């Protein structure tokens, strides 16, 4: 089976938040995110095969698969958690996280890795939820969540550098961000 088409059978229910990505784990150990990788104004799928660490980009026209291309292979111990344009070059960049909470940003030009930098390390008990430009400075910021207190937080970034933080709303009892391990849950839905 062609690795670029094997993902077609995976149920993917991505949620786009202010043109930022929220990652969903899908059936079969694959993960997905959304961004416009080829600059045609249409969202494209970014897929990760957790078994091979390979990423693939599916170029879409509305809901129609147009073409596919491989992206960089992720290193062992790191997972793809999102995509946003951190260096403001007009190309989506990968956000990675490892088991210690360390984040990294891989700068891309199309599907080609052109550089990388470590981002801030998440505090224990907090999980990365998504990215969006909350303070309007043109750089994506991290959205974090802790299930212990149901508190959300925004980490303001300048490229890969932590600038400041603010607590967001506390989620009501019984509500949470979506379970990223269930392919039928919407990420970042309350």
Regions found by a protein language model. Give the residues of each.
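Sec-dependent, cleavable N-terminal signal peptides
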Residues: 1-32
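Trp/Gly-enriched beta-strand/coil motifs that build multi-repeat beta-propeller-like domains
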Residues: 29-190
């Amino acid at each position: 089976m062609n690795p670029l088409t094997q993902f077609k059978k995976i149920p993917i229910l991505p949620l786009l938040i202010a043109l930022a990505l929220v990652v969903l784990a899908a059936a079969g150990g694959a993960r997905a995110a959304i961004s416009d990788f080829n600059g045609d104004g249409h969202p494209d799928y970014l897929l990760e095969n957790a078994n091979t660490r390979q990423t693939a980009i599916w170029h879409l026209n509305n809901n129609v698969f147009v073409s596919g291309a491989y992206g960089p292979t992720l290193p062992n111990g790191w997972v793809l958690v999102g995509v946003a344009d951190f260096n403001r070059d007009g190309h989506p960049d990968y956000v990675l996280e490892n088991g210690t909470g360390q984040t990294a940003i891989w700068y891309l030009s199309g599907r080609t890795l052109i550089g990388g930098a470590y981002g801030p390390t998440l505090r224990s008990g907090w999980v990365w939820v998504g990215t969006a430009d909350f303070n309007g400075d043109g750089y994506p910021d991290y959205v974090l969540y802790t299930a212990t207190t149901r508190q959300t937080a925004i980490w303001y970034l300048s490229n890969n550098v932590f600038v400041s933080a603010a607590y967001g709303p506390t989620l009501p009892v019984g509500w949470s961000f979506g379970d990223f391990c269930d392919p039928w849950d919407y990420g970042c839905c309350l």
